[in-house]
Amino acid sequence: MDAKKLDTGPRDAINWLPDEILGKILSLLATKQAVSTSVLSKKWRTLFKLVDTLEFDDSVSGMGEQEASYVFPESFKDLVDRTVALQCDYPIRKLSLKCHVGRDDEQRKACVGRWISNVVGRGVSEVVLRINDRGLHFLSPQLLTCKTLVKLTLGTRLFLGKLPSYVSLPSLKFLFIHSVFFDDFGELSNVLLAGCPVVEALYLNQNGESMPYTISSPTLKRLSVHYEYHFESVISFDLPNLEYLDYSDYALYGYPQVNLESLVEAYLNLDKAEHVESPDVTKLIMGIRNVEILSLSPDSVGVIYSCCKYGLLLPVFNNLVSLSFGTKKTRAWKLLADILKQSPKLETLIIEDLNGYPLDVSMPLNQVKELQILEYGESDDEVKRLKSFLGEESMIEVVFPEV
């Protein structure tokens, strides 16, 4: 009898693990696979209730042009309905829902609202919604007033319409928005962010019309803005406690308000737009003058150089200790020399290469301790340019990092 137990034990060893461990294992599986274990036995039906992460995706491989008319099928609805029913009211940590809903398809929209309401009632802390809706899609009131939500992702090409005034997400710290369109883009700050009293990080990735033209929050510490559409003319940043900024956009006519007094680290990637003949980045550059770490893409360098030609006076970067400077054209090196003069504490300078560096431009490297050159081939021409760049008696450490 004992021998038989020893023989069968290993094959059934997983059943002897604590329920909490089995629940964690199930949470690592794809939701559809995890659901399938519920048919094994009554115990596994109970164990499935411990799964704290649900991920649903109605995508069908190879849809191609058919995606324009695709909506989630009845089998997808049955899967989600069955899953949430099996879990009853057990706590849940994360819901990820990616699905296609037709224009004016109130039945499917009601399903989405019901699924979201279910997890909100179970204390969800992270929700990822990627809803392809060819009409307006109003978020459920339960989601917009969820007290436990910490991280929210919304997308893609989602038209939300007018947000209700009662938005209240008291625990939300991380907000990711991918091509989401509001009825009024002032609502991003005036309604959505205003209803998030502890939000710390915002990621905005917009590749369509009507970008938010004002981003305002007293609590935001990290902001990434990636805009890929160039018909806005101005943008304002009212973020007194922001510490990190990653801003990629077309250079605009102006930046009416730039309140970034706490900024420590900034990455700028500003391109020239055909419709903006004379961009003015004066207030933006003044607004980032307190940074300790600054990265300027080659396109940004070109924009700033052009603005300097038409009256931009560079501020003193009193706190700047690390500068990454992109170069494409010979004229950029003159701008680098000007920035170095305005950066009395600069210790680390990072450049892509020395191509195009004019030997007659003198670099004031007095405070710089380390020069990093990302691409360097040690040709005679490069050696000559490097010696000219450093000067005769330079004590700067030159580093060639492996990228």
Swiss-Prot record:
Intervals holding LRR repeats: 239-262, 288-312
Protein name stated in the entry: F-box/LRR-repeat protein At1g06630
UniProt xrefs under SMART domains: FBOX (SM00256)
Domain F-box: 11-59
Residue ranges crossing the lipid bilayer per the database entry: none
Pfam families, sorted: F-box, LRR_At5g56370
Gene3D superfamilies: 1.20.1280.50, Ribonuclease Inhibitor
Keyword Repeat in annotation: yes
Protein's UniProt keywords contain Repeat: yes
Keywords assigned: Leucine-rich repeat, Repeat
InterPro entries: F-box-like_dom_sf, F-box_AtFBL13-like, F-box_dom, FBL60-like, LRR_dom_sf, LRR_FXL15/At3g58940/PEG3-like
